[in-house]
Swiss-Prot record:
GO terms for cellular component: cytosolic large ribosomal subunit. This is Large ribosomal subunit protein uL18. It comes from Prochlorococcus marinus (strain MIT 9303). The keyword Iron-sulfur does not apply. The lineage of its organism: Bacteria, Bacillati, Cyanobacteriota, Cyanophyceae, Synechococcales. The keyword DNA-binding does not apply.
Amino acid sequence: MSNLSRKQQTQKRHRRLRRHLNGTAQRPRLAVFRSNNHIYAQVIDDEAQNTLCAASTLDKDLRTSLKADGSSCDASNAVGDLVAKRALAKGIQQVVFDRGGNLYHGRVKSLADAAREAGLQF
């Protein structure tokens, strides 16, 4: 058994992932943060240390259209679709997916699938 809490395990995985993931201007990083109640996605250029676009379940565009709270797979689909549309509007087509130390399952996976369906390539 591990002596680390689940949050500490997630942070450890995230540190390990970030050693290899780096966003550039041509291929920025799509970073996902998942809390208990909401999900957030940002497209980040690590070289310029600049956030190019972002979306979350707290966005005004999504708050009215979401029926449940922001902790469902449907909400993650909406966030993935919105962040992909905003990235494509800025001319970003390819990204590097950063799952933030979370397992690629559930809400993180549904966000990634929705972003792919909307046109982002990763």
